[in-house]
Structure formats: structure tokens, C-alpha cells
């Protein structure tokens, strides 16, 4: 119970929710070709759950050809790509398949992962690709915003990715990548809390004071490893004709400000999609997602389990409608936590237009 201005509120009383629509979300993409091999890109969230007003998500410069006609540099740039600016970092492969606010055409289901590894940071990445092999190394400021104050509390973040991706035939593709992200100290690192759009699961397991924007990440777990973090993820992808398998096997270790010991979180995701009909316009999908770890130092692990099944129909290549049934359970949460013994389930229907 919390008393404010003489009013007592039970912070563990669930807000009542029912059937109804979410607010519409929208993205605006601006892309420009400045010169051969030099591009600029900017993404704006025109409307989001967390921010209802228009604001910029990211913007960056990408170079994949030599701006100077010099043979040695031309040969190098056949294999190298450079990106610099304020961008969505390339940690893991799951961010290629998630819903990014209004852009949800790449997500076979409606919701994202329980632990959503997605953020934008200021820095640079260098890619090398050859014969199906790929490698990336990057360095960023480690936070959503570029900041120079409190330098004693801030250090760069380093990220790497290695992998292999090959289309062996028209029917078979295989991809396997491993990614690593690390920062020694930060005022507010957001690797698992950088989604500034918000969850699709409005107000689930929130109390009666919940608002659409303040509790924008309902249904998700943000482990709070905001001061230091070391995270690794392995992503296998196999496609045979219309059948796809994608996996996400992740381990993150770190702590929040004021904590003297590290906490560990683990997440596993298995997703299967089957696309069929002419031009693979119809699909069915299933995903099983678990996340487990410590909410605070010295406490037992808690676990969240989510099952999602659904499908969709591409009316055209850029118009999609999809449906999902989601069932999420919370295990071993403290008795004082509103999520103790919690569960939510139900249907979601979503329409997507990309143009």
C-alpha cells in the first residue's frame, strides 16, 4: 500500500483490461544516395505507444564503395562496409525479425521477445563479407544519447558479430551468427530497454496507476543491467522451401548502479514459420520464448514463459494482416511483486502497410 496526498493505493491491484484496439503506430523512412557507394538514412517514429508525438529514432551514414577512385581502396571496399552515426546496433539477428514500432512486416507474429535486445547508440561499425562469411566490429558511446558529462561513470561499448550465411540452392538457405556486446560502465545502458516504441501487450499485469506511455513495456522483462553488461547471443537460421527455423540463445551478465555483484539472465527462443500458397502469401508461425534470471542480487531466479501461435496473409507484398494467440506465465516471482503467479493470454490481430 502506498499513500500519497492522503490517498492510499494498493500497488499490487491489477488494472482491469478487456477487448479493444491499440493505438496506431507509424514510421517514416528517409534514404538518400549522396554519391556512388555513399548513403544516408534517417528513421522517424511518427506515432508510438511510448511517445505519441513525432520524434527521430536514428540516422546514419553508410559507405560500401570507395569515394576515391584508387585501385587498392576499390579492392578493399569490395568486401568492406562502414556505418557511422546514431543507429540501431547490429547485436544479434533477432532485431531483423522484430516489430520496430510501425514497421512490423518482418515479424511473423505480433509481440517481440520477452527480453528485447534492441537499442540505438552513437558510434560506428565496420563489416567485412566474403564468400558467405561475415564479421563486424563496432564501438559506441554505450547509451541511447550522446553524453560527455560524468566521464568517470561512462565507458565505450564494444560489439562484434561473426557468422556464415549462404543460399545453397533455391530451396535451401543456412545462416549462423554469434554476437557479443560489452560495456564496463554506463550511467544508463539500454541494450534490453532501448525499445522506445513500446509493447503490443497493453497494460498486462500492471497496477491501477498504469498508463499507456509510462508503462509502455508491459509484458516484457527489462533486467536492469544498466551500469555494466556483457551479453552474447547465437542465432541459427535454416530455410527449406517454405519452412523456416530461427533460434535465439542468449546470456547476459551485469549489474545496475549501486549493485556490487553481477546478475545473470538467460533467454531462449525457438521460432518456426511455414509459408505457402502462390508467392508464399500465407503463413503460419509458432514461437516459444523463455527468460530466467535474478531481479536483484542474492535473490532466486524468476522465470517467464511465453507461447505464441498465429499466422498471416500478404494481400500484396507490402500489405499484411496477421493474428496471434499469446499465453505468458510468470514463475517464482516474489510474493510482493504484482507478477507473482501471474498469467495473461488472448488474441491479437494486426494490420501492416509498408510503402
Question: Where are the language model's segments positioned?
Answer:
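Short glycine/proline-rich turn/loop motifs
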Residues: 6-9, 217
Amino acid at each position: 500500500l502506498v499513500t500519497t496526498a492522503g490517498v492510499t493505493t494498493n500497488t499490487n491491484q491489477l488494472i482491469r483490461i478487456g477487448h479493444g484496439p491499440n493505438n496506431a503506430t507509424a514510421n517514416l523512412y528517409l534514404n538518400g544516395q549522396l554519391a556512388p557507394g555513399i548513403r544516408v538514412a534517417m528513421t522517424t517514429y511518427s506515432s508510438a505507444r511510448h511517445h505519441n508525438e513525432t520524434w527521430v529514432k536514428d540516422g546514419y551514414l553508410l559507405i560500401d564503395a570507395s569515394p576515391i577512385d584508387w585501385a587498392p581502396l576499390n579492392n578493399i571496399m569490395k568486401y568492406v562496409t562502414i556505418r557511422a552515426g546514431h543507429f540501431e546496433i547490429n547485436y544479434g539477428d533477432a532485431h531483423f525479425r522484430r516489430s520496430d514500432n510501425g514497421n512490423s512486416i518482418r515479424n511473423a507474429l505480433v509481440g517481440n521477445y520477452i527480453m528485447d535486445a534492441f537499442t540505438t547508440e552513437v558510434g560506428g561499425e565496420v563489416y567485412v563479407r566474403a564468400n558467405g562469411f561475415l564479421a563486424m566490429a563496432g564501438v559506441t558511446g554505450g547509451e541511447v544519447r550522446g553524453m560527455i558529462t560524468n566521464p568517470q561513470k561512462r565507458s565505450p561499448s564494444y560489439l562484434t558479430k561473426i557468422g556464415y550465411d549462404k543460399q545453397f540452392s533455391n530451396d535451401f538457405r543456412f545462416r549462423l551468427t554469434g554476437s557479443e556486446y560489452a560495456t564496463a560502465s554506463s550511467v544508463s545502458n539500454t541494450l534490453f530497454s532501448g525499445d522506445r516504441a513500446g509493447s503490443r501487450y497493453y497494460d498486462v499485469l500492471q497496477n491501477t496507476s498504469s498508463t499507456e506511455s509510462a508503462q509502455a513495456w508491459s509484458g516484457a522483462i527489462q533486467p536492469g543491467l544498466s551500469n555494466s553488461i556483457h551479453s552474447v547471443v547465437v542465432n541459427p537460421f535454416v530455410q527449406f522451401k517454405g519452412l523456416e527455423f530461427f533460434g535465439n540463445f542468449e546470456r547476459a551478465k551485469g549489474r545496475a548502479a549501486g549493485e556490487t555483484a553481477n546478475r545473470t539472465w538467460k533467454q531462449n527462443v525457438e521460432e518456426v514459420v511455414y509459408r505457402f500458397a502462390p508467392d508464399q502469401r500465407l503463413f503460419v508461425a509458432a514461437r516459444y520464448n523463455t527468460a530466467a534470471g535474478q531481479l536483484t542480487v542474492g535473490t532466486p531466479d524468476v522465470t517467464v514463459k511465453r507461447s505464441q501461435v498465429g499466422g498471416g496473409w500478404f494481400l500484396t507484398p507490402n500489405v499484411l494482416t496477421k493474428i496471434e494467440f499469446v499465453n505468458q506465465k510468470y514463475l517464482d516471482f516474489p510474493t510482493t511483486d504484482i507478477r507473482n503467479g501471474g498469467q495473461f493470454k488472448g488474441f491479437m490481430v494486426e494490420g501492416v502497410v509498408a510503402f
